[in-house]
Amino acid sequence: MIQTRFSASRISELLAGGTGKTAQSYILDLAMQSIGLREEFSTPAMTHGIQNQLNGFEQVVKPLFPNAEWHDEFILINEHCGASPDILNESSPMDIKCPYYIDTFIEQINKPPSKYFAQVQMQMMACKSEIGRLVFYLTKPEEWGQETEVVEYPFPLELRFKIFEFTKDNEIQEKILEKVEESQPKKIQMIELLNTANVISEEQFFYEQMNGFVYRKLQECNNILNLASVIRVNDKFYYKK
C-alpha cells in the first residue's frame, strides 16, 4: 500500500462545512491513491499556475527576500499530514499563486481566498514558523499553439503582484489537526472498502444494469462509510442503489 497523507494544498476541503461530501471526496481520493489509483486532472489555469511559479519567485520574491530559496518539498507535521511550501525564507514558508485571468488576480488580491489562508497556516505548522506569506503574481498566459515568447501585460511589475503576511492562527491550526485526526480512520476504512470491492467485468456491469440494477459512481454516495460493499469495474468504483 502506498503511504498517503493529508496536505496543505487541499486542507480546506477537510475544513469545509455543509454535508461533508467535500471532505469525503478528498478522503476518498487519498484512499484511491493509497491503492495505486490516481486520476490526473489538469486545466489551462492549473498548468499556467505551475509553469509560472518559478518565474514569480525570480521576478518578485528573490529581489525582496534575498535569502529565500525555492523548496517545494513535503515537510511532515505528523505521521498523517504535512505541507509543501513553494518557498522558504529562512524558516518561514511562502506560497505563490499565479492567477490565469486578470479579474481573478484582482479579486484575490482584494480578498485572498480562505482556502489559501488555511494552506499557509498548515505550511507554518510544518515549518514551525510564526509567520507565513502568500504571493499573488500576474503574468500573461501563453495561448495554445503559440511558439514565440509571450508578450507580457503592459502593466508595471509592481502592479502585477501582491504579498500577504499572515501570523500564526492557533484556532485554525488546532482545527486542522482535529480534522486530520478525525479523517485518518475514515481513510483507513475507505481503503479497506476499496481493497475488498467485488470485481466484475464490463459485460456483467452492462447487462446487470440492462436488467434493472442501478449502479452509481462511488463519489456520488452521500456516506461511503455506510456502504457494506462496493463494486469495481477496471479501475472505477461503484455502489449499488
Regions found by a protein language model. Give the residues of each.
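Accessory terminal regions of nucleic-acid processing enzymes
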Residues: M1-K241
